[in-house]
Amino acid sequence: MIYFVFVVLMGLVVGLMAVASNPAPYFAALGLVFSAVVGCGFLVGYGGSFLSLVLFLIYLGGMLVVFAYSAALAAEPYPESWGSWSVFLYILVYLFGFLLVGYYCYGWWYDFYWMSLDVFGEMSVLSGDVSGVPMVYSSGGFLLLVTGWVLLLALFVVLEITRGLSRGALRAV
């Protein structure tokens, strides 16, 4: 289990370095999706399967709006990819910073103890995160609908803002 968590956390670091080091929004969005997947995999490793599914859907909804906005504003015919030298230098700087912080925190890293959600419920039928689902749909159902509506509205607002004087992404039929 510890190897799974280690690999997932290293994947999260690699994905975040891919987001931070790339100037083109197309490849940065791919790194952001990868980071969201491995971050939710980290939550699954600690027993939060439903929570990771909900967060993954929220991440994808928010990233759709951000990607539409950034791709419409920064449309480049030849974007820089992960193979260019400037991106490679940024990755080396971020990797050096990560190793420096890891070396600094190595002495007291194991003073904290992380527990799974299922540690205290050995005889429970439900896992730790699934027991909160009825609260989301009973008292938080209206807020869930409002959140979905706001995400859809934000997508249309971004598409209209980036349209400008040209025809843009939303075309009148």
Curated annotation (Swiss-Prot):
Membrane topology qualifier: Multi-pass membrane protein
Disulfide bonds: none
Matching InterPro entries: ComplexI_Subunit6, NADH_UbQ/plastoQ_OxRdtase_su6, Nuo/plastoQ_OxRdtase_6_NuoJ
TM helices/strands, residue ranges: 1-21, 27-47, 53-73, 82-102, 106-126, 141-161
UniProt EC number: 7.1.1.2
UniProt keyword NAD present: yes
Record keywords, A-Z: Electron transport, Membrane, Mitochondrion, NAD, Respiratory chain, Translocase, Transmembrane, Transmembrane helix, Transport, Ubiquinone
Main location: mitochondrion
UniProt-annotated location(s): Mitochondrion membrane
Coiled-coil residues: none
EC primary class: translocase
GO MF: NADH dehydrogenase (ubiquinone) activity
Record's catalysed reaction(s): a ubiquinone + NADH + 5 H(+)(in) = a ubiquinol + NAD(+) + 4 H(+)(out)
Gene Ontology cellular component list: mitochondrial membrane
Purpose of the protein: Core subunit of the mitochondrial membrane respiratory chain NADH dehydrogenase (Complex I) that is believed to belong to the minimal assembly required for catalysis. Complex I functions in the transfer of electrons from NADH to the respiratory chain. The immediate electron acceptor for the enzyme is believed to be ubiquinone.
Family: Belongs to the complex I subunit 6 family.
Protein name listed in UniProt: NADH-ubiquinone oxidoreductase chain 6
Protein's organism: Latimeria chalumnae (Coelacanth)
